[in-house]
Amino acid sequence: MASFKIEGGHRLDGTITPQGAKNEALQILCAVLLTPEKVTIHNIPDIIDINKLIFILGELGVKINKLDKNSYTFQADNINLEYLESPEFKRDGSSLRGSIMIVGPLLARFGKGYIPRPGGDKIGRRRLDTHFEGFIRLGATFRYNKEEYFYGVEAPDGLFGSEMLLDEASVTGTANIIMASVLAEGTTKIYNAACEPYIQQLSKMLNSMGANITGVGSNLLVIEGVSSLGGCTHSVLPDMIEIGSWIGVAAMTQSELTIKNVSWENLGQIPSVFKKLGIQLEKRGDDIFIPSQESYEIQNYIDGSVLTVSDAPWPGFTPDLLSIILVVATQAKGTVLIHQKMFESRLFFVDKLIDMGAKVILCDPHRATVIGHNRQSQLKATKMSSPDIRAGISLLIAALSAKGTSIINNIEQIDRGYEDIENRLRSLGAKIERIEA
């Protein structure tokens, strides 16, 4: 297992360009299964989770041509459905949560889709019910092999449009149901659909392939089924989570950074939440400029009560950045309550921050109060392990600001979501190296 060795306390300086959005790319890659024609995708991040999915597509028989580091063509004109029932697929699919999204396209085009119980981050119970209830509403039959933890849906007579009210605005669930619906007979209406930019991008891509999806950007999607889809060219948005991570790096290390080509219109509440912590952000065209700040102060509510930062489905604040907000707050002036509503164990990494000297009170699995040091006390370096992608990058940010040299183990978790992170940090002046065990 590899580790990062980080010498903290150094200010960074320079310009960084965010990678393509991981969560969008997972959906877009699965959508190539909907057509036998060639699909070209640009700005695909070169990270573990994406590369695992590309490998699975290749094993399914998709012809893959790598144009450059972040661009590929895919052609799913000779799919090997037998792979879905192989021991290799049970191994490969179970290691990646995003693999669940191959089920919708396979069900739509071939009448069946199978998946082992997916893996990914261990950040609480993340149900798959929304996916399969949607498929059942479209006319599929569902089966689950408890012994082998294997899910399957089949629709030998095809899928048929239906109205459905999702019990949760699941991003991956919405994406999966959209991809199943585009080739269904008739009209599908999805109420309480997720409307994140990732879903908007998927819908725009499918429409460019010949689908008929309206209501894009709202929580009511109407899909008129078509008989087939064609090829297209698509470019993945910059990763809003990585953009928020770079803002956190700049704030904690008192650095002046410019983040290029951020797609401001798709950042939602991210800039405003950081500003509530006192972080200065400047819009320069489609870039974010963050000046070096000696200190920053959390804004209380107008009645003087303590600020609460909580997550919610889009257009609410993304849960993927709450751990970074928590770390940034440790050096702010003031107090903030972090309320993680959507997952019940994403805050459990705070014990590592407390070991570093942060003042954090874990109220329960969903809430933590952070009392900022106002730069009066620097975090102390320590040895720690990365429990998941977002906690991992948050601990890395804390280590970059800490006094002394920190070691972070289990960094494959960080590699799952962040492309070439140590070299990109070094280009800004960070003292970080990868140690292979």
Language model: regions and residue ranges:
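Short, structured segments at the rim of ligand-binding sites
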Residues: M1-A437
